[in-house]
Amino acid sequence: MKAHKIFWLNLAAIIIISIVVSGGMFLAMKWEQIHLKDGLKKVLSTYPIKNLETLYEIDGHDNPHYENNDQDTWYIESSYSVVGSDELLKEDRMLLKVDKNTHKITGEYDTTTNDRKNATDSTYKSYPVKVVNNKIVFTKDVKDPALKQKIENNQFLIQSGDLTSILNSNDLKVTHDPTTDYYNLSGKLSNDNPNVKQLKRRYNIPRNASTKVELKGMSDLKGNNHQDQKLYFYFSSPGKDQIIYKESLTYNKLSEH
């Protein structure tokens, strides 16, 4: 009888210890996520940059892993892609180069269309642009008025978005490597997120499309200055081609999507 009682006491002790340890680990993981989100909030609070020409006066993060052949240059890139069955069907891409030395912003707007049935019908067009007084203007004449208006009205999320609102989602996972300062955020966003609303309105994406987000970059998470940022939105609807929006701000290195 005594041995039986000791057995149950030991079992109860093991269960209690397991609960305490598991609870402690859960709280530690939750606290770490809160801490990382607070750090990312400091980084994302430096946006929006409504006037791209203010980047002339902003220093970036020199990544020692990159060979900087093009010093003191910001690269801003965005792309809207339609992907079906692992193949690119359509892509609109804007790339701007912000030269801090010459105080000039130049770049191009590219359009790519691939025909599923006939590869010879695929098209690629590029339109050189520059930024003057925070407005995108063409360096060559564009005859299509709709396309011209679309490009001239182009805005990046770093200009018009609410990036800190991404952190309001309860379905996010954040990781950070303090030895390299690389971080990664991934998860789902609701249709109420202002960035999701803006992109769906801009690109006529179905309202019921689910949205996944991924944010990659390099930062000490103290918000001291602008760092390399790469932002991805994945929109999916049953029976529809996937839509991907990408945007990046990088210093002295062209983003590699």
Swiss-Prot record:
Membrane topology: Single-pass membrane protein
Keywords: Cell membrane, Membrane, Transmembrane, Transmembrane helix
InterPro entries referenced in this protein's UniProt entry, alphabetically: Csa, Csa_sf
Bilayer-crossing regions: 6-26
Family annotation (Gene3D superfamilies): 2.50.20.40
Gene Ontology CC terms, in alphabetical order: plasma membrane
Protein source organism: Staphylococcus aureus (strain MSSA476)
Top-rank lineage group of the source organism: Bacteria
Subcellular location: Cell membrane
Source species taxonomy: Bacteria, Bacillati, Bacillota, Bacilli, Bacillales
Protein name: Uncharacterized protein SAS0186
Family the UniProt entry places it in: Belongs to the staphylococcal tandem lipoprotein family.
